[in-house]
């Protein structure tokens, strides 16, 4: 099953949109944009499913959850960064290994959001580090839905170093 159109970078337009959104947020005065929250956590091998989650926004309106299983090596330090737009209608969740490429073999992964719907989601086999750039997974290796970015069983090649999600608040009916 193909990923919903417009949710992933196929032509570069979504990357441009995300870059512009992030640049606009970076150029605004600090007092008008919520401070991003970055939390370090260990990604642990052993084949057991683990989860890590964080909340952000007024009243912890949004949640980002990273669920995974991996093999090989030892624990790796990863980070989850969350931030909201000035009007709190958009939030970003970035999960990554700051040292670039992970040496763990991921058997599965899923990054999901609560309280919002994904407008852009991307997964990378290698995160930017020093002079190296992000290397995205192939489109067939992962899927993006309204609430999650996750591996495609049988197609995912077990390399993961970064996930990026930009989501918009779900509308609440009166």
Swiss-Prot record:
Keywords per UniProt: Angiogenesis, Apoptosis, Endoplasmic reticulum, Golgi apparatus, Secreted, Signal
Chief location bin: secreted
Domain of life of the native organism: Eukaryota
Signal peptide positions on this chain: 1-32
GO BP terms, alphabetized: angiogenesis; apoptotic process; negative regulation of apoptotic process; positive regulation of angiogenesis; positive regulation of endothelial cell proliferation; positive regulation of MAPK cascade; positive regulation of phosphatidylinositol 3-kinase/protein kinase B signal transduction; positive regulation of protein phosphorylation
GO cellular component: endoplasmic reticulum; endoplasmic reticulum-Golgi intermediate compartment; extracellular region; extracellular space; Golgi apparatus
Localization per Swiss-Prot or TrEMBL: Secreted; Endoplasmic reticulum-Golgi intermediate compartment; Endoplasmic reticulum; Golgi apparatus
Keyword Acetylation: no
UniProt key word Endoplasmic reticulum: yes
Family under the similarity heading: Belongs to the MYDGF family.
Function description: Bone marrow-derived monocyte and paracrine-acting protein that promotes cardiac myocyte survival and adaptive angiogenesis for cardiac protection and/or repair after myocardial infarction (MI). Stimulates endothelial cell proliferation through a MAPK1/3-, STAT3- and CCND1-mediated signaling pathway. Inhibits cardiac myocyte apoptosis in a PI3K/AKT-dependent signaling pathway.
Protein name: Myeloid-derived growth factor
Organism the protein comes from: Bos taurus (Bovine)
Lineage, uppermost ranks: Eukaryota, Metazoa, Chordata, Craniata, Vertebrata
């Amino acid at each position: 099953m193909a990923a919903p159109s417009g949710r992933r970078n196929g032509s570069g337009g979504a990357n441009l949109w995300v870059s512009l959104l992030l640049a606009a947020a970076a150029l605004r005065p600090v007092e008008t944009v919520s401070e991003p929250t970055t939390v370090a956590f260990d990604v642990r091998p052993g084949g057991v499913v683990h989860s890590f989650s964080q909340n952000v926004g007024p009243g912890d309106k949004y949640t980002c959850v990273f669920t995974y299983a991996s093999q090989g090596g030892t624990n790796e330090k990863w980070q989850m960064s969350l931030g909201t737009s000035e009007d709190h209608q958009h939030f970003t969740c970035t999960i990554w290994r700051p040292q670039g490429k992970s040496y763990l073999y991921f058997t599965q992964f899923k990054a999901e959001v609560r309280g919002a719907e994904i407008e852009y989601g991307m997964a990378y086999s290698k995160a930017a580090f020093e002079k190296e750039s992000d290397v995205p997974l192939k489109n067939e290796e992962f899927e993006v839905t309204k609430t999650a970015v996750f591996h495609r069983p049988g197609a995912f090649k077990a390399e993961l170093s970064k996930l990026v999600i930009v989501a918009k608040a779900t509308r609440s009916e009166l």
